[in-house]
Every structure is written in structure tokens, then in C-alpha cells.
From Swiss-Prot:
Protein name: tRNA N6-adenosine threonylcarbamoyltransferase
EC number annotated for this UniProt entry: 2.3.1.234
Sequence similarity: Belongs to the KAE1 / TsaD family.
Native source species: Neisseria meningitidis serogroup B (strain ATCC BAA-335 / MC58)
Domain of life: Bacteria
């Protein structure tokens, strides 16, 4: 069965073809990054219009790449939410119209479920169950995943998502949009503990997270540096040091919370998905992750246990059609009919009912 996947939740237009027998056949992506850069962020109206312009050419490009035709498509999957309303409508309308024209079923997909399952597109796939860390510009959540459609929310950010905190901090440092990736790049040249920022909620017993206070700590440090230098410009090395300290703080919090989730669930496999999953420091830290089961005081300590950690291929960390095509394929025959204008800009993953 050949499933066409369509992603249009924000500022990437993604189209892909997934074959249930042969795997991913084609993957085409257009990013609107350059278009939004001059505005310092995503402009929803511009995003929607660009999706409309790109969907047909990208679909035809995928078909050519796979050596297939419209008649070979067996189902059309699309992102129903969450995301920008207008952007979602562009993809939904196109998917429903195409499915109607081809007389094929349409499968609505939750955007975060697409991210959650994206590591299954890799050659080395995780086995269920696992703890999933969904970490992006819009969401930071820890989930217990026991199978396709069986997801339980364990904890999440109570304010800014980690990716959002990266972008906002980058802006404080004068980095151009999208600044999160640039911040990570500059952090590579930062000195260890030249600055030390707080790790919000790292010691709380629950799995909730918070990153807005960390952003405020960076602002305080930046203002202090500017006052000391008597200028608005931040010295290059100092900026790099701040980037390093900020990134280390975020990664430390994420790692600590995921370890707690592993102890809570008893799982020993972690899946990291979402745009921040491409961060090199995050991959390095999680790649060396171990957990140690707590022991009563005075008793011998349990040996540390190695954790199996899986990331999607880097190309599938950001929004893409491949993850939507794959998630749709996993739900073939379970889809529900939806109208072309029935999108869900706000849609908690916990509300998925299969």
C-alpha cells in the first residue's frame, strides 16, 4: 500500500510517499525559513499562501522520485493538527480534494504522533515500549509509548517549549531568525562554566519542566555584560560562553527528567524526536545515558544500567512529510472521515482515540 503524506502545520511544506512493503519511497521538503527571516518569525498568512503554491509541485516531484503515478496512491495522510490554522487548512484542503479525486481514503494524522514515530523510519528501530522525549519549538513533552496509538503523557513544559526558549534566547543575543540552530553552533566555541545558569525544576519529584526562568537568567547576564562594557555589543567569546551555558542547562534538565521517567516506568529505551533532537549536545548527552535504581541508605548500590537511545535521521527531526506518511500507513484502515476544513490547531496528543 502506497501512502502519500502531507505536512503543512507551520513553515515547512513536506510531501512523501511511504510503501508498507518497501518503506519510504520519496521525500520532498520546502522550507520557508528565508521568506520569514526578514520578519523575525513565522508570518501565518505568508506561510499558508506558500503551502498552497508548493503542494502540487512537491507531490509531482515525489511521484517522479518514486517512479509512481497518482493512480498508484492507495491513501492520503495529512497533518490535522496541532499547528497554525491557515497552514493546516492548506494541507487539509489539498489532501481531501486529492483523495476525493482519486477515490482513496484520507487519514488525518496528529503532528506530534508523526514526530513520535519518526525514529521508526531509521534502519535501526526501537522496540516498544519506550520513553519518548518530544522536543521542538512548540512542544516539550515526555511520553510513555507502549505501541502505535498507546501514548501516555508523563510530563511537559509548563511554559516555554525548549525549542522556543532556544529561539528567544538567540534573539536576546542578537542572533537572526531562526536563531536556535545558530545558538547551538556558537555554543560549540563556548567555555565550560564561564557562565552558570539555573536548571529550573530539575530536582522536582514530578516530570514537569520550565524554561522561561532560564531565559530570564540569560537576559540578566546579557544586561550585566552590556553595563560592564558600556556598549550594546556583546564580545564574541562572551556570547559563545552564554550560548554554551544556556544549552548545557537545557540539556541537563531534559536528561534529568527523562532519567526519572525511565525509573518511573521501568523502561530502558528512549526515543528523542522533534527539531531540537538534531542538537549535537543533546545527542551526545543522551547517547551516553545510564540510569541507576535508587537503593535504601546503607545498602549496596545497584550497578548503572545502559539505556538504548534512538533518534530519527537528522532529515526527519524537523517537520516533514515522511513522518506523516509513515504514521498514516500505521493507521491504514483505522482512519476516520473528516471534512476538508476540520483541522485542530490546538490538539493534545493525549486526546488521540484510535
Amino acid at each position: 500500500m502506497l501512502v502519500l503524506g502531507i505536512e503543512s502545520s507551520c513553515d515547512e511544506t513536506g510531501v512523501a510517499l511511504y510503501d508498507t512493503e518497501r518503506g519510504l519511497r520519496a521525500h520532498c521538503l520546502h522550507t520557508q525559513m528565508a521568506m520569514h527571516a526578514e520578519y523575525g518569525g513565522v508570518v501565518p498568512e505568508l506561510a499558508s499562501r506558500d503551502h498552497i503554491r508548493r503542494l502540487v509541485p512537491l507531490t509531482e516531484g515525489c511521484l517522479a522520485q518514486a517512479g509512481a503515478s497518482y493512480g498508484d496512491i492507495d491513501a492520503v495522510a495529512f497533518t490535522q493538527g496541532p499547528g497554525l490554522g491557515g497552514a493546516l487548512l492548506a494541507g487539509s484542503s489539498y489532501a481531501n480534494a486529492l483523495a476525493l479525486a482519486l477515490d482513496k481514503p484520507v487519514i488525518p494524522v496528529h503532528h506530534l504522533e508523526g514526530h513520535l514515530l519518526s525514529p521508526l523510519l531509521a534502519e535501526e528501530k526501537p522496540d516498544f515500549p519506550f520513553v519518548a522525549l518530544l522536543v521542538s519549538g512548540g512542544h516539550t513533552q515526555i511520553m510513555a509509548v507502549r505501541g502505535i496509538g498507546d501514548y501516555a503523557l508523563l510530563g511537559e513544559s509548563v511554559d516555554d517549549a525548549a525549542g522556543e526558549a532556544f529561539d528567544k534566547t538567540a534573539k536576546l543575543l542578537g542572533l537572526l531568525y531562526p536563531g536556535g540552530a545558530k545558538l547551538s553552533e556558537l555554543a560549540e566555541s563556548g567555555r565550560f562554566e564561564a557562565f552558570v545558569f539555573p536548571r529550573p525544576m530539575i530536582h522536582s519529584d514530578d516530570l514537569q519542566m520550565s524554561f522561561s526562568g532560564l531565559k530570564t537568567a540569560v537576559l540578566t547576564a546579557v544586561e550585566k555584560v552590556r553595563a560592564e562594557n558600556g556598549a550594546d555589543d556583546i564580545p564574541e567569546q562572551t556570547r559563545n560562553d552564554i550560548c554554551r551555558a544556556f544549552q548545557d542547562a537545557v540539556v541537563d534538565v531534559l536528561a534529568a527528567k527523562v532519567k526519572k521517567a525511565l525509573l518511573q516506568t521501568g523502561f530502558r529505551t528512549v526515543v528523542v524526536a522533534g527539531g531540537v533532537g538534531a542538537n549535537r549536545k543533546l545527542r551526545e548527552t543522551f547517547g551516553n545515558m545510564t540510569v541507576q535504581i535508587p537503593t535504601p541508605k546503607g545498602k549496596p548500590k545497584h550497578p548503572s544500567e545502559k539505556v538504548s537511545v534512538f533518534f530519527p535521521p537528522t532529515a526527519y527531526c524537523t517537520d516533514n512529510g515522511a513522518m506523516i506518511a509513515f504514521a498514516g500507513a500505521m493507521h491504514l484502515g483505522k482512519g476516520r472521515e473528516v471534512g476538508a476544513f476540520n483541522v485542530r490547531p490546538r490538539w493534545p496528543l493525549s486526546e488521540i482515540v484510535r
